[in-house]
Amino acid sequence: MADELDFTTGDAGASSTYPMQCSALRKNGFVVLKGRPCKIVEMSTSKTGKHGHAKVHLVGIDIFNGKKYEDICPSTHNMDVPNIKRNDYQLIGIQDGYLSLLTESGEVREDLKLPEGDLGKEIEGKFNANEDVQISVISAMNEECAVAIKPCK
């Protein structure tokens, strides 16, 4: 029986989010609003009413696309907080709108799109000028995105 089990594939099983009580959330922290990982930019609490709990009004900006989301929830309720990882990779190429990135272990990743807008133009410009740069990649809830560029150390 044990010979048939294969544990070589898959991740560690870590959840992409964890619960946190609404009243424990803080500005500049992270929360899942409308199913999207967001950075909290505004937060206000209303007093308890005649019936019910204090309410927390949250305003967040999606960390991947910059859209604004709002939600109101009782302060005693739990909200999902995304597990966010940030990694730096060395840029070694750009091909067909995708970045070629070198990981710390020496492997090459070619599955990340060149970001649109100013950041994408800056990455292309520095690469074309043969500058050694690192790309900061943020990942949360099975999504990844290049968010910053910095010179190699």
Swiss-Prot record:
Task: Output the CDD domains linked to this UniProt entry.
Answer: S1_eIF5A (cd04468)
Q: Where in the cell is it found?
A: Cytoplasm; Nucleus; Endoplasmic reticulum membrane
What Pfam families does the record point to?
eIF-5a, IF5A-like_N
The GO molecular function terms of this record are: ribosome binding; RNA binding; translation elongation factor activity
**What is the predominant subcellular site recorded for this chain?**
cytoplasm
Q: Which InterPro entries match?
A: IF5A-like, IF5A-like_N, NA-bd_OB-fold, Rib_uL2_dom2, Trans_elong_IF5A_hypusine_site, Transl_elong_IF5A_C, Translation_prot_SH3-like_sf
Record-level GO BP terms: positive regulation of translational elongation; positive regulation of translational termination; translational elongation
Q: Which domain of life is it from?
A: Eukaryota
Q: What kind of membrane protein is this, topologically? A: Peripheral membrane protein
List, alphabetically, the GO terms of the cellular component aspect: endoplasmic reticulum membrane; nucleus
Q: Which SMART domains match?
A: eIF-5a (SM01376)
Instruction: List keywords of the entry alphabetically.
Output: Acetylation, Cytoplasm, Elongation factor, Endoplasmic reticulum, Hypusine, Membrane, Nucleus, Protein biosynthesis, RNA-binding
Family indicated by similarity: Belongs to the eIF-5A family.
| Reported function | Translation factor that promotes translation elongation and termination, particularly upon ribosome stalling at specific amino acid sequence contexts. Binds between the exit (E) and peptidyl (P) site of the ribosome and promotes rescue of stalled ribosome: specifically required for efficient translation of polyproline-containing peptides as well as other motifs that stall the ribosome. Acts as a ribosome quality control (RQC) cofactor by joining the RQC complex to facilitate peptidyl transfer during CAT tailing step.
Assembly description:
Binds to 80S ribosomes. Actively translating ribosomes show mutually exclusive binding of eIF5a (EIF5A or EIF5A2) and EEF2/eEF2. Interacts with DAPL1; interaction takes place at the polypeptide exit tunnel of hibernating ribosomes and prevents translation.
What's the protein name? Eukaryotic translation initiation factor 5A-2
This chain's source organism reads Gallus gallus (Chicken)
